[in-house]
Amino acid sequence: SELAICGYPIRDLDRLMSFYLAAKNAGRYLVIDIKQAYLLKLFSGSANFSKLYPSPKDEAIKIFIPRGSWGLLDKDMKVFSERQLYMDYAEWQREFLDYPNKVDYRDVSKNQKDFVFYCSDFNLQNLIDIKPNPGSSYVRSLTEPFDVEMELKEELIKNWFEHFGVISKERD
């Protein structure tokens, strides 16, 4: 009933498709990472693979625009120019700033019930701005840890989600 957060390997387009279909069937948008949007764009432009995956402009997909390195995303554009905003992103990312289905943390935060939000282990800081509501959920579709380093990483991720009240502090 609140924000649904999902995690899976960023280049695993089959898992992306699973979450895409689940979000669509639930009447929600799948919010994907800008890198995933780029991958979908490449497949959409391919003669052989264009029908395998949805276009990054698909009506059931939203593209999450993170803060750039200067953090101008939510700043007053009367003070900063549009050119400066675009320069805050890598060249390959800039085209997605003009997509009609782009969203940023403000959109996700305001309309949490409308989204299944992809959040990789490397972008957990986006949760600081989004502030998941109580009752939000997390589905982790990743390999179970099989060494100490992976166990430590999983513990770190659990701590983030516990902090935001997405998962319970009770542990096995």
Residue ranges of predicted features:
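Acidic/His-rich, metal-assisted hydrolase cores and their charged scaffolds
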Residues: 1-172
